[in-house]
């Protein structure tokens, strides 16, 4: 396929929760585009930079040049900022009477792109942000998506940047907890991220020596967890480490949510109380939370993010709009957004990682 002519200016934004590696994508996309002779604009906090002249006291749109993206590959967060509350097709606004309503500024967004002479958008985000990008593409905006989720649950890519960093953080935490759990003969319940899939829990639990790993794909029983703890007691192992994905659920039950927010969470606290009641063992919960998203990305995530950023610009060159870049067969390829968002990549319950964990004596609570 021959490159598409007429590209002079592109925009980049980041949406949804942050992930280690976002800045590496921005740097690679910017430098690759500049090599093509294009101008690059950064949109602050998703699409907010197009709707407001100033965002958080800064210009809503920033010109990205080589100096501005120098030395950011190793930095966590995103120099453009992000938001998880920027659904353009249902944006929350405060009405004149003080109540909250919804508006759809998507047509205004597209008009702003035209007015600014932006020829294409590179949208970096998770399933929510990429769904918005897909809908904007269907309305005529030329978009290329870059997948971003530490959960590693998008079916169209073998790996997402930020995942390995999250696993590294969780694994280190599990390792540190072994000594204190053993010293006090406690059960430690460590809640990690993973709303719909258990990739972080599984890989960190296996690497970090967890005794029980609970994931959304395998419903658990508190009684079976108690049996594993009792088995360790009989072997004079008077402590246990349990890692649980935030979206895990008991057999016949539902995931735990934080109040009425609709956000996953709380399973670590609830499970710790149940285990202590059933076993009589002192049980302490620990929620790792946003520490899994923060800090400098590990080298693998930096390199994958750089590859994604460069590939996104190449997709713009080739006119592969309405697509997302993803890792397939070890190479970065373009996948239609509709196809990319149609499948959640779940942990195969009979896969090699689960089989390995079981052979090492790890319980999945089933």
What residue ranges belong to the model's regions?
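Short Gly/Thr/Asp-enriched flexible loops that form oxyanion-binding sites at enzyme active sites
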Residues: 24-29, 128-141, 201
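A short acidic, helix-capping loop that chelates divalent metal ions and anchors anionic groups
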Residues: 88-89, 153-155, 295
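Flexible loop/turn connectors
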Residues: 303-317, 321
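A cross-family phosphate/adenosyl-ligand binding-site feature
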Residues: 1-14, 23-117, 124, 128, ...
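Short beta-strand elements at the ligand-binding edges of bilobed clamshell
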Residues: 156-167, 296-302
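Accessory alpha-helical/coil subdomains and C-terminal extensions
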Residues: 112, 120-125, 133-135, 163-184, ...
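Short, acidic/small-residue loops that bind anionic groups at enzyme active sites
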Residues: 37, 43-44, 136-160, 215-221
């Amino acid at each position: 396929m021959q490159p598409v002519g007429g590209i002079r200016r592109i925009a980049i934004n980041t949406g949804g929760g942050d992930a280690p590696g976002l800045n590496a994508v921005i740097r690679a996309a910017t430098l690759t585009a500049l090599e093509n002779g294009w101008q690059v604009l950064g949109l602050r906090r998703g699409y907010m930079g197009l709707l407001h002249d100033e965002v958080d006291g800064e210009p809503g749109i920033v010109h990205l040049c080589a100096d501005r993206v120098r030395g950011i590959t190793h930095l966590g967060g995103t120099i453009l900022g992000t938001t998880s509350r920027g659904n353009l097709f249902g944006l929350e606004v405060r009405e004149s009477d003080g109540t909250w309503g919804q508006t759809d500024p998507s047509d205004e967004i597209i008009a702003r792109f035209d007015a600014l002479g932006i020829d294409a958008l590179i949208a970096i985000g998770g399933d929510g942000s990429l769904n918005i990008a897909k809908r904007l593409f269907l309305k005529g905006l030329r978009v290329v998506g870059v997948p971003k989720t530490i959960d590693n649950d998008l079916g169209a890519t073998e790996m997402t940047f930020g995942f390995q960093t999250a696993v590294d953080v969780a694994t280190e935490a599990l390792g540190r907890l072994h000594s204190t759990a053993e010293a006090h003969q406690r059960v430690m319940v460590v809640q990690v991220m993973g709303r719909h899939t258990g990739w972080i829990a599984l890989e960190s639990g296996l690497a970090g020596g967890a005794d029980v790993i609970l994931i959304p794909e395998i419903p658990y029983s508190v009684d079976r967890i108690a049996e594993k703890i009792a088995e360790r007691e009989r072997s004079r192992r008077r402590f246990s480490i349990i890692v649980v994905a935030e979206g895990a659920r008991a057999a016949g039950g539902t995931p735990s949510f934080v109040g009425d927010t609709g956000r996953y969470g709380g399973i670590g606290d609830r499970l710790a109380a149940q285990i202590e009641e059933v076993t009589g063992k002192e049980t302490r919960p620990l929620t790792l939370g946003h520490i899994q998203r923060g800090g400098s990305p590990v080298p693998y995530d930096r390199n994958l993010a750089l590859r994604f950023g460069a590939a996104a610009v190449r997709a713009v060159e080739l006119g592969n709009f309405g697509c997302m870049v993803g890792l397939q067969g070890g190479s970065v390829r373009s996948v239609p957004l509709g196809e990319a968002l149609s499948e959640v990549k779940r942990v195969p319950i009979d896969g090699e990682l689960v089989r390995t964990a079981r052979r090492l004596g790890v319980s999945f609570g089933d």
